[in-house]
Amino acid sequence: MEKIYVVTLHRYEDLEGFYADMESNGFRINLKRPISRNTHYYMTDAQAVQLVEDSRVLAVELRPEERGLFPRPLALINNLPYNVNGTFMKSGSSVNATDFQWGHIQVAGDATERGKNAFGSGGSNTKTGNVEVFNNGSDVDVVICDDPVSTDCKEWVSPATNQQRFQQYEWYNNLNSYVTSIDDDGTTLPTGSYPYVDQATNTAFHGNHVTGTVAGRHYGWAREANIYHLDVLSASATPVMALFDYLRAFHKHKPINTTTGRRNPTVTNHSWGYGADYSGDWPTGFDISDITSIVYNGVTYNSGNPGPNGWNFPGIEKDFGIGANKTQYPGRVAAVDADVEDAIRDGVVIIAAASNDNFHIALPTDTEYNNYVTAAFGTRYFNRGSSPGAATGVICVGAISNNQDQRRATFSNYGPRVDVWAPGYAIVSAWADPSVITGDYAGIGLADSKYGGNNYYYPINGTSMASPQVCGVAALLATNKKRFHNTDVSKLIQSQSISGEMDFDLGTGDFADYTCKKGSPNVQLHIENPRPTSGVCDTGSTDGPRLDSTKPSQCFPRRSTVFYAA
């Protein structure tokens, strides 16, 4: 019986020859994507196994939904500086509309303002402060890839011009000529006007919250950035398999900005990831009899050959990280990873959440990368992370908790594939109308007295909340850059981030210790004003040093605006 398989090639240059060979061998196309290395074909399982042997082919996989993998929101529920001055909320049951999210003071503040071992759960719930943020994100395009974002939320209004910054871009009408073509079965990608929603019709909240942290005027970082949105999570979403095709076409074909003389940088946030959710079938968790075997670092463990701590859930959680209540597993999709790599190569900046499964994420070169569990739900790799967050080149963000010490959040994935940690617990941001929201959060939300009308806010947790902290900071770094790729973002973030201040291994240090490090970087997001408060600029270059007129031989670094060549 024929099924639909996604065939991913190693090289884009091989596509035309591959198309011709597949056609001559009688394979029908389900979906041809000329901008992508991925093509969807009808074939049998036996043909799929045989096709993998073609040296041009990287992967042949069933579509992710047919493997039990679905995209999930990852929430648990010219420098123009500005100041963030007021109360920063980090923990507690009380929050006000005038509170700022604590990511601002954590990321832009100094050691005193961060208040380690004093500010947060176990210490003071709020902190009054004043931090300077060095830029506002003007002339940068941020794209929020998430569930629906309300077009009319007041958080998207420019503080400088009082104009709405949300761009209702017509993705299908403008870009379908670059993205898709009619295939053997007549299938096409969506057409017509893009299905935007406003506060009165937005049944979701996650996209609003993420957007608020990236670019909100009160809760966010890039307060003057242009805001774009692609829905990847709702019933009317853009097909995930075409998401990065649209992002690449958008980036390549956007007009020249007449103010800067160049195309705006494209900085994208992905607070979602593929995974398998078994909580519906096992609402109270797994029983040890549900687990058949675990292959860990090449050794097979089971009831007859248990690990050091025994074949029971306390034991296998300590030894391998497989817990009775871990009913969600991250999943990788080779076709999505290939699209991500191509988008990064084109210059699209991709920042993504590490995911909320509390699993160790290994690098492909690590022995742990090939660990898998066989259970009642099938066989799953559990140390590879999620697509797109763990794909090569993506800036993968883990979540810091709101404890007064600076530990990772207990839900956050961790390990060497995480690039940087950022605040992701009790993050206050924009919200949707509680009377319209459906699902578990129906009726939940707080009216935003700053704006009145149909505007709301609420604090939630997740790596979904950590990733937009990094995305927002990246948008600030992007302003006035002649080129701005993922490698540039990574270098800039790493050059400023704080090393060694996070607390790991506060318990036993094994996988059952939810503060375990296991190869995680001790690196948390940080930015600082790149210029001293006095002195004159070197007029020879916008990327040059800062000079103090009283000390003409002394140059101050401008780390936030350093240009890194390819």
Specify the residue positions occupied by each region the protein language model found.
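Hydrolase catalytic cores
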Residues: 211-215, 223, 228-235, 407, ...
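Active-site-adjacent substrate-recognition loops and nearby beta-strands
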Residues: 120, 132, 244, 352-394, ...
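C-terminal subdomain of the subtilisin-like protease fold in secreted/lumenal serine endopeptidases
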Residues: 229, 244-245, 255-282, 394-396, ...
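Protease zymogen maturation seam
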Residues: 53-140, 151-157, 523-529, 536-537, ...
